[in-house]
A protein has these predicted regions:
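Beta-hairpin "wing" of winged helix-turn-helix
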Residues: 60-73
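N-terminal helix-turn-helix DNA-binding core of bacterial DNA-binding proteins
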Residues: 7-49, 77
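Short, structured secondary-structure boundary patches
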Residues: 54, 70-73, 86-89
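Amphipathic alpha-helical dimerization/coiled-coil segments
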Residues: 1-9, 16, 26-30, 79-98
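Basic amphipathic alpha-helical segments that dock to polyanions
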Residues: 54-60
């Protein structure tokens, strides 16, 4: 059953047991990258909470965090990695199956 496979996949990747982290990865799957400010607005978390979630995703290899110089100074940008991309692809395939 696909539901069992999906639950197992999420349990095996405990970092995704928190809905906001799964949501961040799903968003990055479609956008490929996002500025920290964009993620703040989308998640409605405070800066500290969001940064902690991103650190966990980064430590797990699902996202890459880069500080990029801009006219306004260095800004944090988050990119989905190949590992994150593959995981979300598996999640979406399981959701599509009937």
């Amino acid at each position: 059953m696909e539901l069992e496979k999906l639950i197992k996949l999420l349990k095996d990747n405990k970092e995704l047991n928190v809905g906001v982290r799964l949501g961040i990865l799903l968003g990055l799957y479609y956008t490929r990258s996002a500025w920290f400010k964009e993620l703040l607005d989308a998640t409605r978390l405070n800066k500290g909470e969001l940064y902690q979630h991103l650190k966990i995703l980064h430590k797990s290899g699902y996202v890459e965090i880069k500080y990029i110089p801009t006219v306004e100074g260095k800004r944090l940008k988050v990119f989905i990695t190949k590992k994150g991309d593959e995981l979300i692809r598996q999640v979406l395939e399981l959701l599509r199956e009937k």
